[in-house]
């Protein structure tokens, strides 16, 4: 029978089993190697308020913290949200 992809849509080569993860969007279980991963780095502070906070800060060169978040999507949610 013909196959659609050489890797069968996942990153599992010699492993027999990989643990499932939950989709960030819908909560569906998907294998960890098949899920589409997206690493998001965002500022905690909104861009409009950055200047106000830096002016009000007592420290001169205070770097505002960032928000690091790893998103896992199932295949259908990744296609739907065009990730």
From Swiss-Prot:
Cystine pairings recorded for this chain: none
Key words of the record: Ribonucleoprotein, Ribosomal protein
Gene3D superfamilies: Ribosomal protein S26e
Keyword Ribonucleoprotein included in the entry's annotation: yes
InterPro entries: Ribosomal_eS26, Ribosomal_eS26_CS, Ribosomal_eS26_sf
GO BP annotations listed: translation
Keyword Ribonucleoprotein in record: yes
GO molecular function annotation: mRNA binding; structural constituent of ribosome
Cellular component terms per the entry's GO annotation: cytosolic small ribosomal subunit
Family indicated by similarity: Belongs to the eukaryotic ribosomal protein eS26 family.
Protein's recorded name: Small ribosomal subunit protein eS26
């Amino acid at each position: 029978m013909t196959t659609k992809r050489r890797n069968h849509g996942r990153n599992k080569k010699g492993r027999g089993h990989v643990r499932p993860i939950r989709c960030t969007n819908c909560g569906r279980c998907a294998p960890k190697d098949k899920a589409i991963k997206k690493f998001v780095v965002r500022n905690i502070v909104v861009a409009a308020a950055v200047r106000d906070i830096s002016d009000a800060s007592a420290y001169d060169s205070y770097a505002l913290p960032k928000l690091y978040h790893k998103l896992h999507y199932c295949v259908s949610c990744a296609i739907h949200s065009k990730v």
